[in-house]
Amino acid sequence: MLRSYDLHRDEIPPGTLYLLILKTLARSRELHGYEIANSIQRISDGVLEVEEGSLYPALQRMLIKGWVTAKWGTTAGNRHARYYQLTTAGRKQLGVEMSQFERVIGAITRVIEAV
Amino acid sequence: MIWLRELSRRLRMLVHRRQFEVDLEEEMRLHLELRQQEQYQSGMTADDARAAARRRFGNPTALREDSRIAWGWEWFEHLAQDVRYGLRMLRKSPGFTAVAVLTLALGIGANTAIFSLIDAILLRTLPVASPHELVLFSDSPEGGTNSGTQTGHWMRFSSENYTYFRGHSENFKELCAFQSSWNHLKIRVAGAAERPDLAYGRLVSGNFFSFLGLTAAAGRLFSPDDDRPGASPAVVLNYAYWTRKFQNDVSIIGKVVEVNGTTFTIIGVAPRTFSDVKYDRPDLWLPLVFQPQVMSTNSYADDPQMYWLSIMARLKPGVTLRQAQAVVSSQLKQILATQAQRETTQQIANSYIELAPGAGGISYLRVTYSEALQILAGIVGIVLLIVCANVANLLLSRSSAREKEISIRLAIGASRSRLIRQLLTESVLLATLGGALGILAARWGVDILASLVTGGTSIVKDSIDARVLLFTACVSILAGILFGLVPALRSSRIDFAAQVNGSARTRLGFGFANGLVACQIAACLVLLVGAGLFLRTLQKLADQELGFDENHILVARINAEAAGYSPAQTPTLYQALIDRIEAIPGVLSATVDYSEPFGGSTWTSNFTIEGLPSRPPGQMKVHKELVGPHYFETEGIPILLGRDIGPQDRPGTPLVTVINQTMARKFFPGVNPIGRRFSLGSPFNDNEAMTIVGVAADARYYSLRDPVPAMEFCAAFQIPDQGSHNSAYAEDVEVRVSGNPRALPTEIRAALAQVSDSLPVTRVTLLKDEVSASLRLNRSAAEVSSAFAGLALFLSCIGVYGTMAYRVSRRTHEIGIRLALGAHRSDVLWLITKECLILVSVGLVIGVPLALASTRIIASQLFGIRATDPLTFATVAILLVLVALAACYVPARRAMRVDPMVALRYE
């Protein structure tokens, strides 16, 4: 079950893929997988490079959890695409993940900055 | 709640998993294509763009797998895969599948059938509130009334006892009481001119229905106020009676009926599911307080020595049956000690109450058949184990045929656990198929078993219910794992290099297979010994001398009460019937009998002999029978001294009786009993004293097992309305004939109808058939255990054959060498036979102690034979050796015929 968290690359801190997806979806109304990948990359100025395929198992898990819903729609280029949308539970989860992340980052920062 | 919603999403996913695959595929393709397009537009060649897109995306197969795992249904898909594969494998070897499924169906079907009987008879609870709180002060199914003193195990209680226990019930929430017996009622809707109807009624305490937590189907049920002195008489109808008599007419509520001469108001109907707490279901219930009116006797409530009630109670939470029992038993002793010293100290010390769980009510079937059913459950359990051993053996020999397939699977990377799961799936599949077929087999098996065991009463309706199905499912899966596990573990532990290159000569599973066969033989021995003991018991019982001429006596069951005769009219009626029947050619003699031999009812009493001091009541016990004139002549029982009951013994003449030899020997040792007088009860009562006019030879009336008790046969016509209401009428006319008795029933019916055309004659049977019906339980024990032992023998035979055949095929090479080196064919025969004998001997060595231990359980069901009967054991052992030798004959012949040249060239 934890396999999806291993992103096989070091670029994304482990455990933050959900957070990134949730945050990305929170910013827009609905996105399909390719747009999510691009969005993460663009906003991080190309620093965070997701192994793009791993978005999909993660999205499946988020569907099971009920954090996102999906429905089929049409892209600007008139292609069939599955659009993901944040649910109320997802929004709540985003808060949880955010505070968890901040706690960890805060702790790490304190350790690094300690003399 | 969150997990519930999550589960529902997962389930939806399981249903639409094809769609899921398609969606995911399309989503991923879109992603790849868009990325590729982007790269292409940024100036890459088409090939580079595709490669880059793939690189960034990762491994799509792994990701797809990962997404599927996310939904958590991978085990299900594996299972479906395994089942499909398993079914294919089973189809590929139809012979194996058929043998395995059929034997499993027999084994599981037998267990299902027995379980459904056990479920219906032993496990079902009363349809009342919290049945598991209920306890009975005695669960004896006998109904009746005792008067005088009681000692030992108390089955019935006086009104005074009930009042006492109700007032001293620290351990009980509440108590209720009901009549142990029931009453014949004559019922007439008030004002109707019709002849009264006969019905059964039970007297119950006012809180009976509220105690049970029941609500009326119509009207209302009793309240304690209905059971107080001065209450207006009320009855509650049984639902079945309401349907039968009043067609569920609600307007009957509030109507007035005349019951045995007293007017009662119908106040309600009990719920449909509830028939009573006791197996003999009454048609209606009446409050205890109306006992004198209903029974036309004195009030039992005022008589502390009239024991007529059954008591039921609800345990308080946290109180165990044992605790409550200790308290009530010591309370009972206390009551007896403080009372008017009616009982001796010894009697009081021996008195005790045995509380019984009341959840199932008082069941005649449970008490009568619980031991037989438990023995049966043991027998079918052993049969199922033998079946499992057989199938395991088949699987083992098959797994050697599949060694190659399995080694290849292991070689290309299947994990051992996955392989075991696959093999177990196949076994459980086999067992499931067997179970499904077994349920079909059980459907008619239940009827056969029920009629064998209980004599055909349709006690087990809708017998295959959800509980039984659940039981079968569990048994099937357990059996599948039981017989599949070891073969699966073994076959997945293969040296596959040796297998694949064809050089394997493993001795895989040999010890285990032999062990299985030896255990089969041991189990078979246990069943055969059991069956042998039951058969010999049946034979011994059937050979018992009865003491009367049962082959030439016809019994016609009549009911003068239903025809409206009063007790005072009966002597004339019965004499007329006897005279008319004796006029039929071929009839030697006829009489009436108030309770038929082996009819199941007994009437015992203590008695006092004139001129002798009263002895403690326990020692002076006699079985009383009421009989008509020429009784002993008709029954063919020799009169040893004095005379038979005759037509001269009419109302108004001094009371006479004939005693049996046992009574004469026990109570009149060394003296002539003719002319002596005794009276029932104590002390001696001159008004009711009877004079002994004859001594008859002993005859078996009640039981083929127990010794004949002391008996006296009173002339019934002398006091037509004597004793309890229930025996004022003769149960049957008995006719002794000279020729073939089967030719006469129609003539007897016609003769009876000539005398009284309103007299119901329910059936005319040969007494011999009635006696043999009393052996039903013994006969069915013998039949059922023989059938299952035969099945076990057959299965073990297959087991021995299979193992020996397998061994011979594995040793062909070795046998070839032996023959080439000069061994004789007879040496080879001995080689194989010896192995078979060793196998059987091991089985016997295991089986004999097992049988000795388990036959002790059935010892109480045996008669005239010890549970360790050496003859039975020896016969069974010899039978097993012979059968095993026969089973190994074919493989042994095959071994003898081995051609050394062929054997050595092989491989």
Region roles according to the model:
Chain A
Residues 1-16, 97:
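Intrinsically disordered, low-complexity serine/threonine- and proline-rich regulatory segments
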Residues 11-54:
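N-terminal helix-turn-helix DNA-binding core of bacterial DNA-binding proteins
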Residues 55-62:
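Basic amphipathic alpha-helical segments that dock to polyanions
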Residues 63-79, 85:
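Beta-hairpin "wing" of winged helix-turn-helix
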Residues 89-115:
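Amphipathic alpha-helical dimerization/coiled-coil segments
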